[in-house]
């Protein structure tokens, strides 16, 4: 999965999780609130994975550019 996909899915899961928590709070459903917390945390993890992939790609690109400059 690409970093953009991770971030999009993460944002969606985080938003859905927050909505579930709100609905669970409004209806008194501890189960729904709990599901919402889990889904929100999952979303934050997916976003972090996307950020990590971006950082790794940037580091690889910088290293490759430095290697090309050194070879000149």
From Swiss-Prot:
Region (Disordered): which ranges?
1-55
Which SUPFAM superfamilies does the UniProt entry name for this protein?
Hypothetical protein YjbJ
InterPro entries listed in its UniProt record:
CsbD, YjbJ_sf
Return the Low complexity bias intervals: 35-47
Which family is it part of? Belongs to the UPF0337 (CsbD) family.
Q: What is this protein called?
A: UPF0337 protein bsl2407
Source species: Bradyrhizobium diazoefficiens (strain JCM 10833 / BCRC 13528 / IAM 13628 / NBRC 14792 / USDA 110)
Q: What is the lineage of its organism?
A: Bacteria, Pseudomonadati, Pseudomonadota, Alphaproteobacteria, Hyphomicrobiales
């Amino acid at each position: 999965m690409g970093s953009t996909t991770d971030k999009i899915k993460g944002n969606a899961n985080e938003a859905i999780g927050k909505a579930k928590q709100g609905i669970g709070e409004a209806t008194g459903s501890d189960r729904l609130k709990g599901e919402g917390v889990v889904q929100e945390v999952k979303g934050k993890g997916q976003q972090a994975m996307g950020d990590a992939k971006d950082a790794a790609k940037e580091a690889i690109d910088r290293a490759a550019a430095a290697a090309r400059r050194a070879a000149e």
